[in-house]
Amino acid sequence: MDLTQIQNPSFLKDMSISELEGLSEDIRKFLIEELSQTGGHIAPNLGVVELTIALHKLFDSPQDKFLWDVGHQSYVHKILTGRAKEFGTLRQYQGLCGFPKRCESEHDVWETGHSSTSLSAAMGMALARDLKKTKEYVIPIIGDGALTGGMALEALNHIGHEKTDMIVILNDNEMSIAPNVGALHNVLGRLRTAGKYHWVKDELEYILKKIPAVGGKVAATAEKIKDSLKYLLVSGVFFEELGFTYLGPVDGHDYEKLFETLQYAKKTKGPVLVHVITKKGKGYKPAESDVIGTWHGTGPYKIESGDFVKPKEVAPAWSAVVSETVLKLARADERIVAITPAMPVGSKLEKFQKEFPNRMIDVGIAEQHATTMAAGMATQGMKPFLAIYSTFLQRAYDQVVHDICRQNLNVFIGIDRSGLVGADGETHQGVFDISFLRHLPNMVLMMPKDENEGQHLVYTAMQYEDGPIALRYARGNGLGVHMDEELKAIPIGTWETLKEGTQAAILTFGTTIPMAMEAAERLEKAGVSVKVVNARFIKPMDEAYLHDLLGKNIPILTIEEACLIGGFGTGVVEFASENGYHSALVERMGIPDRFIEHGSVTKLLEEIGLTTDAVVDRIHTMIPSKQKRA
């Protein structure tokens, strides 16, 4: 079937099961071929082909509402709703988004990117439906990994209490990104092995009611028997205790079983949870056999071999530099513990996990818990290293404020994927952390200019015992610089001069330092002398350096790959104003006041005007012509 000719899912209504099975094969082949060129979340989507087709066949989108939790498993949904022809642009600038996007299609009713939001949003939609007295189905699809998020559990509790009509699809593939952890995962494991409970209890009730005269009374009395049967067949039926009708487990790749179960769910009043078992990566051997999450989301790859197409790496990944330095220090200090909220692979903590399994803690998708747990460990003299993506640190903000900073606890936060991350787009760009951390009392915030300075700042963080300290580091690789053998502590709040200059100064840090250096060199050739400063401590700033620099009364340009509002540049302007300097001398470059879409980092920087050319042009406008050297 030519998938690019699909305009909407209505064609599924008349298809037989054998035809649907053929369509499943076509979709898997299409995904494997297309994603080999663009990259993307291949394994989650290969696992939900039949489930997505079944949902679109039995329900009527967009009248019926599908909410894809996290959203990375929505590719099949996009194909069935007329977007197959756009897959060549997947996750590229102004191309097809890798997550549901309301402006893309009326079938995308809820935008996602972070996990565990679908149930709360679905409850909102269901309550709105009931208030408006309409009849559509509301169907959140949530994975077993996302179900460990506290927000999802809060929503389950509320939905069950209110007895709201809703069909929750639990897509259980036993993995989120990496293998799942936690007690809830173990509950689901027991449910998988006790899948006959729902059908047995219904058959029992049906048979008892057929007994003449006394059947109804016996059936009523049998409720107690049925409850006992429930605990006999399923050890701890978590969802029914919350008020849901539990259906399953059902094979998520068997159309007959899916149709039977979903039709039953449509007829059932109140909240229903359909437990669907799927195989992540189904239909592509390398992805299907992956047990650690390598094929969850990938770049381009070779279909035949399963080898990833990567440029030759001349420098280590930032995540590896940080995690391996922490590991090196942990060998000499038993107090060091690594913590991750379900991202051991992305944060490059596999080596730490292998060497110190008892000191590497993966809490699952539970950022709030991870953060306060780290705080608790710090009260007992441990040295917790919390490795967390910038975008996911947002989910634990109150814990950083209330539990870490307020108590001034020695927690080292590794803020991975800081700055623009590219293809995952606006839900994942790490551009807000400076603004929401800079104003917190007791917080120290750093970002290195290269991987060598990065390892020294990790060492600095582990030696620091005066409160919380955070290190920002980017996605991707470092610069390939020489790495010192011996680690050293860098004095807190100190900057360094990278290039001397007399007519203007650039203050920057991290990934924008090469841009600043190149701009300064070009300006030098044009007769403009520009100082470049490595402002590696975003907080506290080097106040002595700033006093000296502002006292020279020369233009100052701050550059940051982070949002301008409340950012580093704002801090420099505030310092100038509060200390009697001419704050108009300071201009800022950074991320504007909007969400940044998906695309390559290079393209996005160009689009927002954060390039070497833009820096050169800005400096020229800041320096009066008469001050420029001939």
UniProtKB/Swiss-Prot annotation:
Binding of thiamine diphosphate, residues: H72, G113, H114, S115, G145, A146, N173, Y284, E367
Cofactors that this protein relies on: Mg(2+); thiamine diphosphate
InterPro entries the record matches: Dxylulose-5-P_synthase (IPR005477), THDP-binding (IPR029061), Transketo_C/PFOR_II (IPR009014), Transketolase-like_Pyr-bd (IPR005475), Transketolase_BS (IPR020826), Transketolase_C (IPR033248), Transketolase_CS (IPR049557)
Catalytic activity: D-glyceraldehyde 3-phosphate + pyruvate + H(+) = 1-deoxy-D-xylulose 5-phosphate + CO2
GO MF annotation terms: 1-deoxy-D-xylulose-5-phosphate synthase activity; magnesium ion binding; thiamine pyrophosphate binding
SUPFAM superfamilies recorded: Thiamin diphosphate-binding fold (THDP-binding) (SSF52518), TK C-terminal domain-like (SSF52922)
Subunit structure: Homodimer.
Name the record gives this protein: 1-deoxy-D-xylulose-5-phosphate synthase
Organism field: Bacillus cereus (strain G9842)
